[in-house]
């Protein structure tokens, strides 16, 4: 049952990430995109994740949903600034682009996975789970942009639609796959916080 629940959650969050990615680039498909659409597109990933928890987990907290959406908006611009800063400090080569988008992906994945786990998970994530999500997000940033170059070879250093779709879909998968759970085992040094105390009624013999 636990494995089935994890699989369903992973699939659901992956689809939510895909929806978020499509919403992020949807304004590019409009002939005359409105300022509202362009302004809200950075928050699409957080909005899609919050929508998943609203519909599937029945977590109807408006505060949580609004917080995740706002964090998504801020993270979008933070990752963009960091990636742009890396490009300005490096020579214009394909390897420099990879470093820049890896850095942006790392920052975005660290913030979004930490925020999602903190708001919606019933257990605190261990450092190794956050580390996997963070490194995975960096690799997704590189892979997404490289795929974008194949379809848009003249895109240059500009983010491509493929970047957002690949990154958000992949992050949805990673968040679902490495969702923190309460495990019945002794605490390790990789735990962010100490596990909950044992039951008050341990039933000693």
Language model regions located:
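Juxtamembrane/disordered regions of integral membrane proteins
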Residues: 1-193
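Short, basic, low-complexity termini and linkers enriched in Ser/Thr/Gly/Pro
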Residues: 188-205
